[in-house]
Amino acid sequence: MFASSVRVAGGQDQSWMFGPFEKPAPVNPVIAPRSTSTFRSPMNDSTVLWEEYATFNPGAVVRGGKVYLLYRAEDASGDKEIGHHTSRLGLAESSDGLHFTRRQTPVLYPDRDRQASYEWPGGVEDPRIVESDDGTYILTYTQWNRDVPRLAVATSRDLVSWQKHGPAFAKADSGRYMRLETKSGAIVCRVNGNRLVAARINGKYWMYFNVPEILVATSDNLVDWTPLADAESRLVKVLTPRPGYFDSWLVEAGAPAILTESGIVLFYNAGNSGRYGQEGLPARMYTGGQALFDARNPIKLLARSTTPFIRPTEEYEKTGQYKEGTTFVEGLVPFDGRWFLYYGMADSRVGVAVWDPHGSAVKSPR
C-alpha cells in the first residue's frame, strides 16, 4: 500500500478482527515534541513550552474531509518521571491522514475553573473522541491532579472550544466513585460514513474503561455515566489479564469500540508480565489487542486476539519516556476508504498505522 511500510507483527488472527495494519515508515512519527510552541498558563500566569517534552496518545475524528487529532502534550516541568509533568491537549489536522498541521496553543488544559482541583498540576491526559447523533463531539479524558486519576467528559461543536463536564462518574450512586481511580473511556460507536457515532444498545450508551482490568459503564446522555456493578456492588470486569499471553500484566481500554456485523470490537492496550507473560515479548511492553463482545449484551465476551495486532517494532516506538516500548492505541477513524489507527509511541510521539479492508474477509462495520 505504501512505497515503504512495515507490516504489523501479529496482524489479524481471527476473521472478526480489524487489520492487518501497516505502519507507513516515511511519515512516522506523525507528531513529535516541539520546542517552539508557547502558551500562557492561566494556573500560574507563566509562559510554558507546552509540547516540548512529549506528544503522544491521540484521539481522532474526521470533520469536513480532514482527520483531526487531539493529542496529549507534556511540558518539561517537574522531574523526569512519567506522570510528573503537566499535560495539555493539542489539536492537529490533516487532509491525507498522514501529514499534520498543528495549532500553536492547546485546546484543552488546566484552567481556573471548577475542574482545577482535579486537573492541576498533572493536567489533562489521553483523549478519546466520538460524536453524538447531532454532531456534538464527546471527549473522554483523564483528569490528573497527582492524587487520584479521574475519567472525565468534555463536549464541543468545533473541536476548539470545549465545555468541561467534570468526572464521568460524579453523579453515580451518590458520588461513591469519586475516589475511585478511573481512566481510558472507550465509548461504543456505530460507523456512519467517516463518522463514529455513539450507539445506543438496549436503550443505553455503553463505555468500556479502566486499567488493569476493563470495566463497563452506561449513560443516558453521554456525559453522566454509571459503572455496571453486580448484586453485591462489585464492579463488573469484562476483560482481565491472561497468564501466558501478551496481555498477562494488564489490559486497558483503547480506541472507541465499534459495532460490526460480528459484534462489538473493542481495541485495548495490553501489558506483558515479565514472570508469567508471553515468551519472547519483553516485560512491561505495551502492545495492542482486540476483543469481541455481543452486540446485544456488551458485557458478554465472545472472543479475543491471541497475539498482538500491533506492537513496538521500530526504534522510535522503543525510545523515549517508556523505554520498554509502547504502541498505545487511542484514535481510530474510517477515512478515504481505509482505517487509520493513531497511537502513542513510548509515551513520547504519535504514530499511525493503516488498514485497507478492500478484499479482506473481515466482516464490515455496520
Say what each PLM segment does.
Residues E317-T319, T327-E330:
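Short glycine-rich, acidic/polar surface loops and turns
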